[in-house]
Amino acid sequence: MAVDVTEYHLSVIKSPPGWEVGVYAAGALALLGIAAVSLWKLWTSGSFPSPSPFPNYDYRYLQQKYGEAYVEAKLKRVPPWNAQRTTTRGPPSRKGSLSIEDTFESISELGPLELMGRELDLAPYGTLRKSQSADSLNSISSVSNTFGQDFTLGQVEVSMDYDGASHTLHVAVLQGKDLLEREEATFESCFMRVSLLPDEQIVGISRIQRNAYSIFFDEKFSVPLDPTALEEKSLRFSVFGIDEDERNVSTGVVELKLSVLDLPLQPFSGWLYLQDQNKAADAVGEILLSLSYLPTAERLTVVVVKAKNLIWTNDKTTADPFVKVYLLQDGRKMSKKKTAVKRDDPNPVFNEAMIFSVPAIVLQDLSLRVTVAESSSDGRGDNVGHVIIGPGASGMGTTHWNQMLATLRRPVSMWHPVRRN
């Protein structure tokens, strides 16, 4: 006897087997259980998320500091270089990698090495190594030392190019701002002197400017210079204030190595940060650092490449150097890493990478303190000197930080003078 297929399907739907009913009921109960557990977790967690993946930054701390709920803080987690756009910009950078989309409001004020955003070639120094230690200082509530900051004495905008046919270096002093801001003296006018080092040959002296704080120099100078001298010479830009007794007082100086500019290939234009000449005399060596920030992973990478011409403490003739890198927030130590010790070497090559987890929302509150120290048998190293890098620093420290933010995902290398502690 033939059975109608349609009637058979209807009979199965109207009167399903008992085991199918059990399967459906178990599935429904499982879904209800999962939904109930999820709702319970959301209710008990309130407005706070699960523990932050960043070891040094908990969003509870962000709420406490900024007085915002986590949701509001999360919505504000946009990189500072995209948060604001300046309405007035200086001369555009000549480096192709510095596009408008990648920069922030200070891009027109990058310092003397704004051309250094190229890839860091570490091949001569061997394989890149991870830092030896990562001593944790991530207790948010802990109070630790507050380190001092360097101070800038204004900025000057300059441009220069080299005429290979006539072997002539052309230098233009365009403008200055925030000049002569010194607490110990008052000046009504100033002028600038450009000299060629190490011979201290005078390239040019500007006219005296009466409005000494934000002024337009618009001065152009030229000096004969052999192409081979570009690898050896430096330019010094010095600002002098004129006091009420008509005395010329040095108020700020900056030196620029011509070897880093590639002037035979392209002109240079940028802002230079002036510093106290007395501070420049406190240098006890130089250190080459590379910085990069990966916004997608919110990761800050510091590479301690090498140091040179280190001067040991207490007139020592030999020492074993190493480098400590502190991540600071509002002057407080949040994390610390250090390199391996190099035995008896005033020109050590470290080539060690240090990685910090840094949310973009706190980038503007951060700075780096890089300390060169001497290892000792008792485990307490004497500090040789330090470098401050960040938005609150000055000179090369600010320049390097700004350049890192302007060329995201790419390492930016720069030499820094090591200041005596």
UniProtKB/Swiss-Prot annotation:
Expressed in the brain, specifically in neurons of the cerebellum, cortex, hippocampus, olfactory bulb, brainstem and spinal cord (at protein level). It is a single-pass membrane protein. The modification Phosphoserine is found at residues 97, 99, 214. GO terms for molecular function: calcium ion sensor activity; calcium-dependent phospholipid binding; SNARE binding. Residues 152-272, 283-416 form the C2 domain. Keywords: Cytoplasmic vesicle, Membrane, Phosphoprotein, Repeat, Synapse, Transmembrane, Transmembrane helix. Phosphorylation of Ser-97 is required for mossy-fiber long-term potentiation. The keyword Isomerase does not apply. GO terms for cellular component: exocytic vesicle; hippocampal mossy fiber to CA3 synapse; plasma membrane; presynapse; synaptic vesicle; synaptic vesicle membrane. The keyword Nucleotide-binding does not apply. GO terms for biological process: long-term synaptic potentiation; presynaptic modulation of chemical synaptic transmission; regulation of calcium ion-dependent exocytosis; regulation of neurotransmitter secretion; spontaneous exocytosis of neurotransmitter; vesicle-mediated transport. It is found in: Cytoplasmic vesicle, Secretory vesicle, Synaptic vesicle membrane. The chain crosses the membrane at residues 19-39. It comes from the Eukaryota. InterPro entries: C2_dom, C2_domain_sf, Syt12_C2B. Residues 40-421 are cytoplasmic. Residues 1-18 are vesicular. Gene3D superfamilies: C2 domain. PROSITE patterns: C2. Belongs to the synaptotagmin family. Synaptic vesicle phosphoprotein that enhances spontaneous neurotransmitter release but does not effect induced neurotransmitter release. Unlike other synaptotagmins, it does not bind Ca(2+) or phospholipids. Essential for mossy-fiber long-term potentiation in the hippocampus. Homodimer. Can also form heterodimers. Interacts with SYT1. This is Synaptotagmin-12. It comes from Rattus norvegicus (Rat). The gene is Syt12.
